[in-house]
Amino acid sequence: MNKIQIIITTSWDDGYVLDVRLAELLEKYNIKGTFYVPIRNYERKVMESNILIQISQKHEIGGHTVNHIYLDTLGKTEANYEILECKNKLQDKLGKNIDAFCYPGGKYSERDVKLVKEAGFLFGRTTNFFHSEIKPVYNLMHTGLQVFDHSSVVLIRHCLKNTFLSPIFAYRFFYKGNRDFSALADMILLKLFKNGGVFHLWGHSWEIEKYGLWKELENLLKGLSAHHEIAYLNNTEYWHFVNNKLIL
């Protein structure tokens, strides 16, 4: 595709008030982020508009529905409202195009994928793990690793969401069933530095706070930073790159 063999992209879901801490941490290590923000979230507090605007100056903002609701539980009319209205409201707040969308809870149907595209989003980000191959992204953008220590059962279940087997083989054989996110990140990066690829790190600031993962995350970001052979992109920049619309 071009000489860049390793890409780092990150994304952060739910628009929680501690996303500002995430943004500052990313900026400390010159790493780009895409923040997927719902208009409202009845589970936890969403950041105020002034903070959202502040974060948007250096990072990408993406849509995450109006009410942070699982789209596959809604009828077509309600799902279309959640998708389209979140885009409109964010664009009104920020005065810029919103191109990226993330499915709350990673829940979606083929209908929802179509609605996301019809609303004018370039893609919908999922929660599927262990994707590291640099290849065109059309409708769905999968991820590499979540900042969370999942059980092996959960990690395998996420792998099984895929319609192809490479993430399952990667987890069982290359990553040897490890469940610690820091150890998994080290193994993924070892593989990337050898073979090239993309590392898409994602998570929730509320979860990082709840489980005390800030130090581990900072250590990881520090290790990811300042490599001349790595391209640091937000999610939409990555989409443009793999679809041959961005030259680095």
Label each region the model flagged.
Residues 1-20, 146:
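Boundary/entry segment of secreted carbohydrate-active catalytic domains
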Residues 9-12, 62, 232:
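Generic enzyme active-site microenvironment
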